[in-house]
Amino acid sequence: MREFDPRGVEQRKHGHLHRRMYVSPGANLCWLINGCDKLKPFGFSIHGCVNGLSQRIIWLEVQHSNKNPRLIARYFLRSVKGAHGCPVRLYTERGTENGILAVMQCYLRTEGLDEYAASKAHKYVKSTRNQQIESYWSHFRRQRSSWWIDFFNDFLESDILDLTDEIHTKTLWFCFADLLQDDLDKVKDYWNSHRIRKSKYATVSGAPDMMYFLPEEFG
């Protein structure tokens, strides 16, 4: 990393790395999609979508894999149906898991009359440019996934769990997948209803649900 980005390494080392201000002119202008692999060693992969302006969580799901394009497409279609429309633009990282998603988004925006219609309705970005969802994963790691990691590690240290044993991993999924999804649902509800404070990195502040459903109240 030092060879490819020496300036960035030095900035991180001294705490001088500056985040960009995020600006979005409308509630459904963009959705940002990505996965979280912190619990993947235990067989639980998390996938999420965040609304650009409000930082509202659109979905937060646990599955065996967050690389299955059909599953991700299903999350997307379900959310589009619930929102009665698709975002103007969709941002994802480049990967085979996002291929179906990209095609669907561009198809849904085929008849759009704005600059992001059709093939421009989806854009592949690096994780460093997908800052809203990456920012949320950072919060999620601190607030929730670290608890689950410690919880499962206690099983390992007590020799209760052997991750090389298929019976153990399947039993772990059977016992905890629904509990973890229930926890994610609660995390989603809390996040969407809590107030985001003013920040020099954001143009608006307030509860994500309020900013999403009543964007006109936030300028």
Predicted regions and their residues:
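RNase H-like DDE/DDD metal-dependent nuclease/strand-transfer catalytic core used by mobile genetic elements
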Residues: 2-13, 18-192, 196-201
